[in-house]
Amino acid sequence: MAESYLLDKLKSVELTFHELTRRLADPEVATDPEEFQRVAKARASLEETVDTYDTWKTVQQHLAEARQIAREAASDPELQEMAVQEVNELTEKSAHLEQRLKILLLPRDPNDDKNIMLEIRAGTGGDEASIWAGDLVRLYSRYAESQRWRVKLVSESLGEMGGFKEAILEIQGEQVYSKLKYEAGVHRVQRVPATEASGRVHTSTATVAIMPEVDEVEVKIDPKDIELTTARSGGAGGQNVNKVETAVDLFHKPTGIRIFCTEERSQLQNKERAMQILRAKLYEMKLQEQQSEITSRRRSQVGTGSRSEKIRTYNYKDNRATDHRLGQNFPLNQVLEGDIEGIIQACITQDQQEQLAELAAATA
């Protein structure tokens, strides 16, 4: 591995890993469940890097031995040929391990392990845009289920002809943000709407925002900036009308963000849920500002995560979903059923390659 700075980083990671392993055996840590969990999680995050580094060191040792045999076996052509073949195989394996180590050493997004609020807003296209937003709610719900994540609809504004003008899903599980952050942006659909009598193809859009969940410590909200009103949940009449005002309408004066929560059973729960969504929205706004600064330095092909960036077109006539960042087409039916893991993995790989190229340029 030519890059000495990478070796220095790997040695540092190895030392940290062994120190965390030692701490797990410390009786003081072992008897403190919270600290034990924190140390165990930190150690687990380094384990693949350390294991890969160990494998790489073993390969270097075997490679040096094979090269020596190849040099010294001039009088034995058969042995020399075997040694040269082993050198070639080990060199290829070493290059593969080095590439993997570079990826493992890339700085991690601090939000990658967080749960998220996924917001879908109908864009241009009227009633058809709301129906399309409903299709996206189903798509992400199916994908979340395939990942064994928990999904809950926490806020909704129904469309007049079906679907949603706006919907917010809470998605919880392992590394939710690390995958779904690549879905942020404008999703465009081209199809003949069910509401269209003449059979003309319409283009509609919906915007997806991915908001990592944050706690009160990470985002401070001044109570004076909040306007809170209550309303009755339920339908227009009959038994579904809630006689108690459990719904909460929250307005954040500095940003103009309005959140209407009706999904929880009590007013207090709806207020807590509205505040949780507000914190996530404010945090996402802060992330957008940071991301725009990064983008000005590195024009990412995989996308900026901006709400205004068109990332995918879903064409019903041609039965294809085109991801504009990857420049690739995918089978529409599979994508609509939530089969987007392949797209997301391709985005992750492309993002990593861009970061590696940037790192190489910076250290050249």
Swiss-Prot record:
InterPro entries (UniProt xref): PCRF, Pep_chain_release_fac_I, Pep_chain_release_fac_I_sf, Prokaryotic/Mito_RF, RF-1
GO cellular component: cytoplasm
N5-methylglutamine modifications at: 239
Alphabetized Gene3D superfamilies for the sequence: 3.30.160.20, 3.30.70.1660, 6.10.140.1950
Record region (Disordered): 291-311
Key words of the record: Cytoplasm, Methylation, Protein biosynthesis
Subcellular location: Cytoplasm
A Pfam entry, by short name: PCRF
GO molecular function, one term: translation release factor activity, codon specific
Source species, domain of life: Bacteria
Main location, first listed in the record: cytoplasm
PTM (free text): Methylated by PrmC. Methylation increases the termination efficiency of RF1.
Biological role stated in the UniProt entry: Peptide chain release factor 1 directs the termination of translation in response to the peptide chain termination codons UAG and UAA.
Family designation: Belongs to the prokaryotic/mitochondrial release factor family.
PANTHER family for the chain: LD18447P, PEPTIDE CHAIN RELEASE FACTOR APG3, CHLOROPLASTIC
This protein's name: Peptide chain release factor 1
Organism listed in the record: Cyanothece sp. (strain PCC 7425 / ATCC 29141)
